[in-house]
Amino acid sequence: ISEYQGMGTTLTLAWLKKAESQLYLAHVGDSRAYLVREGHISQLSQDHTLVADMVKKGELKAEQVKNHPQRHVLTKALGNDPWLEVDIRKYDWQKGDSLLLCTDGLTNLVTDEELLQVILAAENAKTATEKLLTMALKRGGYDNITVLLAIG
């Protein structure tokens, strides 16, 4: 039996149809998608984790998630279930919007407010992603860190 049997991976996929002003998002796991619009940041994806489910049920407070011993336990992942239901959503896309896709290696170490401030202050997507990556690495960067940013 392979040491990797039973393991899965996360997926956050975005398809932007600018001509139709539509953003399509497919998501499974604990990587995230954020929309930055008019100076505000919104998490579009929902974490598929045990602790996220506990928060929804009122069994855990949101501020307890970061330190919970089971915070990395996924409830959905690609590769574990042939009948997996992937979250698929459609959003309106507006001129000036930005889309951030990232792994939990970033969001475990950088707050949503910090994400927003870096994106708003950056002159371009490359500068913003490099700054976010540097912030996470300086704070310990113990997990893989992937950061993709589309600035509209």
List the predicted regions and their residue ranges.
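PP2C/PPM-type serine/threonine phosphatase catalytic domain
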Residues: 1-152
